[in-house]
A protein has these predicted regions:
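A short, solvent-exposed loop/turn motif at the edges and junctions
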Residues: 38, 62, 66-78
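Short Pro-Gly-centered beta-turn/loop motif in secreted/extracellular proteins
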Residues: 29-32, 54-62, 70
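Structured extracytoplasmic
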Residues: 96, 100-248, 270-274, 291, ...
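Short, acidic Ser/Thr/Gly-rich low-complexity loop/linker segments typical of extracellular
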Residues: 41-54
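Structured interaction patches on ligand/partner-binding surfaces of diverse proteins
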Residues: 72-87, 94
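Beta-strand-rich domain onsets/edges
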Residues: 6-17
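Short, ordered, surface-exposed loop/turn motifs in non-cytosolic proteins
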Residues: 16-18, 25-40
Length: 336
């Protein structure tokens, strides 16, 4: 449901403030940190913690509005902006018949691309929620930059079953400083002092919203798993068979209560293209809500396994990162 002012004649040159609120159609309560876009001219932004938003210096006219939130059906509509504008958007929760989920067989990816709703509506809905989680993180990282500190621990694993601590430190990462996914280019040479060293880049959450990633991967529903005692839908993705170079396969888990992403697992395909001595590279990433509906990385655990034992029986390396703090430059929903 949408409520808006009517455009009076002769007001095309006036500029006004467009204010509004996004609420749940079921409860009437404001939905915090929903994404609202006013087109043309205005970029997407988050609502505040009460579901309110504002666009300033809006010329009178007709605009396309898009409203998104994880766990809710997207809303697209048209509004007419006049002298005084008050908007109210009601979003309805996503409903997926879990009993109707068909677990498709794992197979070679020969027809990559986003799932077709006509062929598998449940998969298409869950895929859209996965994409929305990723897109929201992308918006958060780029428009509301933040820094987060991770405690890092590096270890070596040996064929005897022993582990040896190698190094530990605390690293600070900027949310908008990251590698971007390119099909078949997840293994590159490093920069600076690492220019002669091959580096494996495992895609991050924003990459799951990238059309390039969608076009080169197949997606399927792999069933329901229990995480922390709650049901989660598992979506698996496979790199296209046509990709000759190393890329990634993986899985993503979304809670069925609100379709928030909780975990992703990533595996390097064709690891021998990265290094003849490597047999596997994998990582598990878990997320937490820093603010309602807004995810940040909580823990990363990466494992690199050697094809043959090295000196002293070395068979692998692990890297664990744990979140210790997040600092926003500007909180989502705040004006600049």
């Amino acid at each position: 449901m949408v409520a808006a002012a009517v455009l009076p004649a002769g007001l095309e040159a006036q500029r006004v403030i467009v204010r509004g609120v996004v609420v749940s159609a079921e409860t009437g309560e404001g939905i915090p940190y929903a994404v609202v876009v006013l087109r043309p001219q205005f970029s997407q932004r988050f609502t505040d913690d009460a579901g309110r938003f504002a666009f300033v210096e809006v010329a009178a006219g007709t605009y396309q509005v898009s409203v998104r939130q994880v766990g809710y059906r997207p809303l697209d509509t048209t509004v007419a902006v006049g002298t005084v504008v008050g908007l109210r958007f009601e979003l309805r929760r996503v409903a997926v018949e879990l009993a109707a989920i068909t677990v498709s067989a794992d197979a070679v990816c020969t027809e990559p691309g986003p799932p077709d709703p006509a062929r598998d509506s449940a998969l298409a809905i869950v895929f859209d929620q996965l994409r929305e989680n990723a897109a929201r993180y992308h918006l958060l990282a780029d428009q509301y930059p933040f820094r987060y500190r991770m405690v890092r621990r590096l270890t070596q694993e040996f064929s005897s079953g022993d582990s040896r601590f190698v190094h530990g430190d605390t690293i600070e990462i900027r949310s908008n400083d990251r590698w971007r996914y390119r099909p078949g280019r997840v293994v590159t040479y490093g920069r600076g002092s690492l220019s002669q060293v091959k580096v494996v880049h495992l895609p991050e959450l924003p990459d799951l919203a990238d059309p390039n990633f969608h076009r080169t991967h197949c997606f399927r529903l792999a069933g329901l798993d229990s995480l922390d005692g709650r049901p989660h839908a598992r979506v698996e993705f496979r790199a296209a068979a046509a990709l000759d170079e190393a890329d990634v396969d993986g899985s993503a888990w979304l809670d069925t209560a609100g379709y928030r992403l909780r975990r992703i697992a990533i595996r390097l395909t064709r690891p021998e293209r990265a290094d003849q001595e490597i047999s596997a590279v994998s990582a598990i990433v878990t997320f937490r809500e820093e603010l309602p509906f807004l995810l940040v990385v909580e823990r990363i655990f990466a494992l690199t396994t050697r094809r043959r034992p090295g000196a002293g029986g070395l068979v692998g390396r692990t890297e664990e990162q744990r979140l210790v703090g997040v600092e926003f430059r500007r909180r989502p929903g705040e004006s600049r």
